[in-house]
Swiss-Prot record:
Top-level division of the source organism's lineage: Eukaryota
Annotated segments matching region Disordered: 1-27
Keyword RNA-binding: no
Subcellular location: Secreted
Biased composition (Low complexity): 1-17
Major localization class: secreted
Organismal lineage: Eukaryota, Metazoa, Ecdysozoa, Arthropoda, Hexapoda
Gene behind this protein: PapC
Function: Represses female sexual receptivity and stimulates oviposition. This peptide has a low activity.
UniProtKB keywords: Behavior, Secreted
Tissue: Main cells of the accessory glands of males (paragonial gland).
Name of the protein: Paragonial peptide PS-1
Species of origin: Drosophila funebris
One of the record's GO cellular component terms: extracellular region
Amino acid sequence: DVPSANANANNQRTAAAKPQANAEASS
């Protein structure tokens, strides 16, 4: 299930980047 694992990693990376993007936008 390599594609599934890659999608999972991408989702986690995106989720981790969202709070950072929000913080940069609000500061």
